[in-house]
Amino acid sequence: MSICPKCGQKIDSNLNKCPNCGNKLDNKDNQINSPQINTSNIRIRKFIPWAIVAFIIVLLIIVFVLVRNYNSPDAQTKILVNAIDNNDSQKVATLLSSKNSHIDSDEASVYIDYIRSEVGMKKFARDIKSTVETLNKSDSKEAINLKTRAGNNYLRVSKNGTRLLIFDNMSYTAPTKKAIVKPKLDTKYEFKDGGKKKTVIADANKTTSLGTYIPGIYSVDAKKETEYGEFSGQLKFDFRYGKSNTVEVNENFNEALLTVKLKGKSDLDKDSLKVEINDKQMKYSSSREYGPYPQTKDVTVSALGKAKGKTFHAETKTIKARDLGNINSATLEFDDEEISDYIEEKEAEENSLKTKLSNFFSNYSFTLNSAISRSDFNLVSTFLKDKSSIYKSIKNNLNQSVAFINPQVISASQKGNTINTKVQHLNSNGQYETTNYELREDSDTGNIQLVDSK
């Protein structure tokens, strides 16, 4: 076999002419070209294995570089740093999540802002790189906590096995704290946690956890419900001011507190004063802040109090929703003339009743003492309602009864035919004691009789 010197076509050694270009060949060309071709083929055969080996080595180097770029401790660190630097909350959430702790992108976004403001990207990148290098050179599996400029832990770095049997696998864990509330009223909170709706019921004046969070400055949109209504706002908590395992939540809702001042109440019984807000009655106090109430609804407020057993109502006022602020006040006035007129009338009646009772107890005292000294129940029986408890008691214990001396009526009230009175008298030791009596008045004759004593 030879090669045409003109076109390079392979030609059978027995041919004198190139079948391709028609060039004529002589025996000299055939003799020269054949050895050259054989030598070239031998060289090519020797080169091919070395070329394959070189290719495999280059390929392995490329694969190693690629694997190292994604799996070495330094590469793992760069992935986290770049994710935070590029505000890739989804990537950060994935890197910080574990089987026992899921972190969503919203929480990761707050965490990124926290690192930027409390650590700074340059310090963060420098600290985490130095920490990983320290751990990578050490055989210890002890974790290292990264701290903010204020000294608060924000990231725990540790070794967790290996990757591809070559590289240390780095573990990045954000520390957590419980966000806690302590409401003054029984409260139901609704908000999103981990992308899902969450409901927490908190009892009044008891510490309750809303959930566990990684470092950040949070403002969580929420709704809450109390006995006074429904509110919209935010649950705010800041890890810069957290304690060892908890961080307190500050509530920021559309709330309206209300203080109430009353005029014309001087003649009313102090303990009977009440305010009525949105149909709910509460004990009155001039220093109390009532509520909170939603700023989205009108607030209606009134007041009531008693004098001589009668209930008096103050004027009613309504504060429109558009006028409600965080702190609101309402001044309500009673009709003091109506109250004073009623008191005068009742006092006149009471004085008349007290006079009537004073005469009754004066006669009763004299008659009872006579009945005791004579052991004659019939003398006093007309002062006692037949078969009443006091009737039976005196009848059965007349001989053991003590003298009833110097009775004085302190107070008296009448409702229908029933009279209640408080009487002070001297006991056998010469000391005053007070007894409450119940009497019945005959509606036809006006006569009164004792029914019970306490």
From Swiss-Prot:
GO molecular function list: zinc ion binding
Chain segments annotated as transmembrane: 47-67
Keywords assigned by UniProt, alphabetized: Antibiotic resistance, Cell membrane, Membrane, Metal-binding, Transmembrane, Transmembrane helix, Zinc, Zinc-finger
Predominant cellular place of this UniProt entry's protein: membrane
Residue spans, zinc finger C4-type: 4-21
Protein's cellular compartments: Cell membrane
Example of a GO biological process term: response to antibiotic
Spans within the Extracellular topological domain: 68-454
Membrane topology term: Single-pass membrane protein
Cytoplasmic side: 1-46
Highest taxon of source: Bacteria
Function: Plays a major role in decreasing resistance to glycopeptide antibiotics.
Record family assignment: Belongs to the TcaA family.
Stated name of the protein: Membrane-associated protein TcaA
Organism phylogeny: Bacteria, Bacillati, Bacillota, Bacilli, Bacillales
